[in-house]
Design a protein with these regions (language model features):
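N-terminal extracellular ligand-recognition/capping segment immediately after the signal peptide
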Residues: 8, 18, 22, 26-56, ...
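Extracellular beta-strand/beta-solenoid scaffold signature
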Residues: 42-47, 69-94, 111-120, 134-142, ...
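Parallel beta-helix/beta-solenoid
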Residues: 29-30, 49-52, 54-60, 70, 77-136, 239-246, ...
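Short, basic, glycine/proline-bearing loop/turn elements
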Residues: 2-11
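C-terminal closing repeat unit and adjoining cap/tail of repeat-based domains
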Residues: 404-406, 422, 429, 435-438
């Protein structure tokens, strides 16, 4: 064990311990141990794994702090792994000297506007456990190429940039679990310009990742932000499960945002499962653009400034057994699907609790320029002006739903409205309550067949 104090580090929070820590890496045994104390550094501690050999960094059960007072990451770990997760692709001295770099039980605090926490380049089987990174720019930055990353039981907190940043990286097999990722100005987990597969985000608390706590001007961001608009980007085979994902509403902000450019990459963002999360309090809670093959099920999604769920230019989206509602009077609820096809909405509850209709004036379920949409077995309650509002849609089926206004003073103008042009639409076997105007508005040009509905008189 290489105790950094035995190599000259003081840990007094004032002395520059940069060279002493480098001395411990250069001449130590690979287990970089920080006893209790505050270790001030002025430059990045860069570790070439091919030269140093297997590396561990330990902060003595969280009692050690590294204070980064210069620009760049406090620790930059550089490997040479150019293969995949396939054992046969691992070459050179990657297994003997580079595998499993582990950083645990240590705090990194930034004291420079461009200070980052940790940067990983071309590593294999990196492990982060019990790490606190705060007041930096970015917390953990993975770039270029990495494989088989584990991030667990970490606090990525109060950073001016991004909490966990997958930045122009080829990365397969990464688990982010049981972490607090909060109050990071430009997003909690953010993916840009990258090729990602097999990412699991599970059991985390991801909150308030926007400008508000930093007292800066608002910028579009999200708790989980995925941008594949850059050519060559693709993000597939992703699980977001059993997290709390919430925020304060901010302009163009989301809890989960997935962006693909119109007519973008050959491989759209897809093969995603978003399941069993608590998601709330943003302008749009979930906003999907250009996605192909996404399952959203079993989530409680609440309190939006615009929509609980906004889907644009997407296909094969399955929305099942979610609960949509507001949480505070000034916020709203609702689902909007635009220019999308092959979407199912099944077993969902959408409730507007505002006595006069939600502030946005939006209907509960809106469909615009869509085709092959199946809505079945849902409850759409207290929608104003409508429960379902469809424009320029074809081959839409709304069956077996309950669409009622349960308020003492009815506010719903219509239960279902189809306008514009379309064909092959079906409204059937629904339970439909009273409204203030025509219960069903089905323009002849919209091509709607209505049959077997039970209308409450």
């Amino acid at each position: 064990m290489s105790n950094v104090q035995r190599f000259g580090a003081t840990g007094d929070g004032t002395t520059d311990d940069t060279e002493a820590i480098r001395h411990a890496i250069r001449d130590g045994d690979g287990m970089l141990h920080f006893p209790p104390g505050s270790y001030r550094i002025t430059e990045s501690i860069e570790i070439n794994l091919a030269e140093s050999g297997p590396l561990g960094i330990d902060g003595t059960s969280g009692t050690a702090r590294v204070l980064m007072t210069g620009p760049g990451p406090a620790f930059r770990l550089i490997g040479t792994h150019g293969g995949t997760g396939d054992p046969n692709s691992v070459k050179g001295n990657v297994y003997p000297k580079q595998r499993l770099p582990t950083i645990k039980n240590i705090e990194i605090e930034g004291a420079h506007a461009e200070a980052d926490g940790i940067e990983m380049i071309q590593t294999l089987q990196s492990v982060f456990e019990g790490v606190l990174i705060r007041r930096c720019r970015h917390g953990i930055r993975l770039t270029k190429r990495n494989r088989n990353v584990l991030i667990s039981h970490c606090h990525i907190y109060d950073n001016t940039g991004i909490g966990i940043f997958l930045d122009h990286v080829s990365l397969h097999q990464i688990n982010i679990a049981s972490c607090h990722i909060s109050y990071n100005r430009l997003g909690g987990i953010r993916i840009e310009g990258s090729e990602i597969r097999n990412l699991q985000i599970t059991g985390n608390d991801i909150e308030y990742n926007n400008h508000a706590a930093h007292k800066t001007e608002p910028e579009p961001t999200a708790e989980i932000y995925v941008d594949t608009t850059e050519p060559g980007s693709s993000v597939n085979e992703i699980t977001i499960a059993s997290n709390t994902i919430q925020a304060t509403s901010s302009p163009d902000g989301c809890n989960i945002r997935i962006r693909e450019a119109a007519g973008g990459s050959a491989r759209q963002p897809g093969l995603w499962s978003i399941t069993g999360n608590i998601i709330g309090s943003q302008e749009n809670n979930i906003h999907l653009t250009g996605c192909y093959g996404v399952s959203l099920s079993g989530n409680c999604i609440y309190s939006c400034g615009s929509r609980n769920l906004l889907i644009e230019d997407s296909r094969q989206i399955n929305i099942g057994t979610n609960t949509f509602r507001r949480h505070t009077p000034r916020m709203g609820t609702g689902v909007r699907i635009v220019r999308s096809s092959d979407v199912t909405v099944t077993g969902c509850s959408i409730l507007d609790e505002h006595p006069d209709g939600q502030p946005s004036g939006a209907s509960l379920l809106e469909l615009a320029a869509c085709k092959r949409i199946n809505v079945s077995g849902c409850q759409l309650l207290d929608g104003t002006p409508c429960g379902v509002d469809a424009t320029d849609c074809s081959d839409v089926s709304i069956t077996g739903c309950t669409i009622h206004d349960t308020r003492e003073q009815i506010q719903s103008r219509h239960a279902i409205r189809f306008t514009g042009t379309g064909q092959g639409n079906l409204v059937g076997m629904n339970s439909i309550g009273r409204t203030t105007e025509s219960t069903l508005v089905l323009d002849e040009s919209a091509g709607v067949t209505a049959e077997g509905n039970v209308l409450k008189s």
